[in-house]
């Protein structure tokens, strides 16, 4: 059984997959990337900040956004968060 969730044309994009560990009480200032980003939380809880909005995601949650929009990351807990991150990097000239 398949349930349609997301479709994105990938022509000329580079796929990068990472496992990311965000240590307790960590804050990363906003930055932007030249990629579409898909994040799935394996363990822990983190907050992604976008302009005036903050999104909290925990185990089993998935977040997809355009990394061109500046975004911050915060782990305000005492536990390390573990994320599965997929980057679709745009071509550069």
Where is each model-derived feature located?
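A short glycine-rich, His/Asp/Glu-containing loop-to-beta-strand
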Residues: 1-30, 36, 86-87, 91
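Short acidic-glycine-tyrosine-enriched beta hairpin
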Residues: 51-67
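Ligand-binding loop in jelly-roll beta-barrel domains
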Residues: 58, 67-93
